[in-house]
UniProtKB/Swiss-Prot annotation:
Co-factor binding comment: Binds 1 zinc ion per subunit.
Entry-linked InterPro entries: DNA_glyclase/AP_lyase_DNA-bd, DNA_glyclase_Znf_dom_DNA_BS, Formamido-pyr_DNA_Glyclase, FPG_cat, MutM-like_N-ter, Ribosomal_uS13-like_H2TH, Znf_DNA_glyclase/AP_lyase, Znf_FPG/IleRS
Pfam families per UniProt: Fapy_DNA_glyco, H2TH, zf-FPG_IleRS
Cofactor(s) the protein requires to work: Zn(2+)
Assembly notes: Monomer.
Residues the entry annotates as binding DNA: 108, 136, 181
One Gene Ontology term of the molecular function aspect: zinc ion binding
Organism: Trichodesmium erythraeum (strain IMS101)
Annotated protein name in UniProt: Formamidopyrimidine-DNA glycosylase
EC number: 3.2.2.23, 4.2.99.18
Length: 300
């Protein structure tokens, strides 16, 4: 599943390519991709004649702020909802690809949005196309009507913990979230109510960098360990963003390019290989149903 760095990379690409272009229309090839509204006609009606002012990311959610084509977007306030929003969650295998409309259609294409600078709503007159490709079909899209509170429509936003790069995310916050918890630290880090956007790959990586074994019970962590973990989370996420994210199976950026973090990963997907620090063979276990990688020597 794409995690915070991958979704951030997609957001950055979308902000470079899709802003201020008229949405001419669209085509929904798999109706269950739509979480809200479930009517294809209502979903497309909410997008046609709009343009995207800005893409935002909250955890693993992508949120596009819309405005009516022809209206200046310079006065839009962040997260105001005058003309609607488009929400996307890639889930396990979702991809958002910016392509030439003449490019052949991938068999797992679920939604197509047609962009251009003209007034026609015909897909044949579009200059650009945004495709939502999703092999496993778990990905979702939302059309948030004007005036509606975004989190009332995309209800998963209500449960998210802090963004790791927000000023409020601190060792004190992390300690408060983990204090007295009787579950393994790896499991706690995967909980989106603890940290928004952190997932399996970067939880393993951050625990390695902080020297904490994934099975360590939260309540047993010292303040020093929590401080180290806080720094490690920020470091590994920024490193992954700089590398364009991680591609082990399905992740591509909006131009269809793989991420490069996998080649420099400390422990994730490297079971049996030597630790990059001490050369001890790395181990892999199942923890709360998730593959978990660690160094038995460096992580105590």
């Amino acid at each position: 599943m794409p995690e915070l760095p991958e979704v951030e990379i997609v957001k950055q690409g979308l902000n470079q390519l899709t802003l201020n272009k008229r949405i001419l229309g669209g085509e929904v090839l798999l109706e269950r991709t739509l979480a809200y509204p479930i009517s294809v006609a209502d979903f497309l009606r909410g997008l046609e004649g709009k343009a995207i002012a800005q893409w935002h990311r909250q955890g693993k959610y992508l949120l596009a702020q819309l405005y009516k084509w022809g209206k200046k977007n310079s006065k839009l306030q962040e997260y105001e909802n005058e003309d609607g929003w488009l929400g996307v969650h890639l889930r396990m295998t979702g991809q958002l690809l910016w392509v030439n409309p003449e490019e052949s259609l991938h068999k797992h294409t679920r939604v197509r949005l047609f962009f251009g600078h003209n007034s026609s709503g015909d897909k044949d007159s579009s200059n650009y196309e945004l495709r939502f490709v999703d092999q496993r079909t778990f990905g979702k899209m939302w059309g948030v009507p004007p005036g509606k509170e975004i989190s009332k429509v995309i209800t998963g936003l209500q449960q998210l913990g802090l963004e790791p790069f927000s000023p409020e995310f601190s060792p004190k916050y992390l300690n408060k979230k983990l204090y007295k918890r009787h579950r393994p630290i790896k499991t706690a880090l995967l909980d989106q109510t603890t940290i928004a956007g952190l997932g399996n790959i970067y939880a393993d990586e951050a625990l390695f960098l902080s020297g904490i074994r994934p099975t360590t019970i939260c309540k047993d962590l010292t303040e020093k360990q929590i401080e180290q973990l806080h720094l490690a989370i920020l470091k590994v996420l920024q490193t992954a963003i700089n590398a364009g994210g991680t591609t082990f199976s399905n992740f591509l950026n909006v131009k269809g390019v793989n991420g490069n973090y996998g080649g420099v990963a400390w422990v994730y997907s490297r079971a049996g290989q030597p630790c990059r620090i001490c050369n001890t063979p790395l181990e892999k276990i199942k923890l709360a149903g998730r593959s978990t990688h660690f160094c038995p020597q460096c992580q105590k």
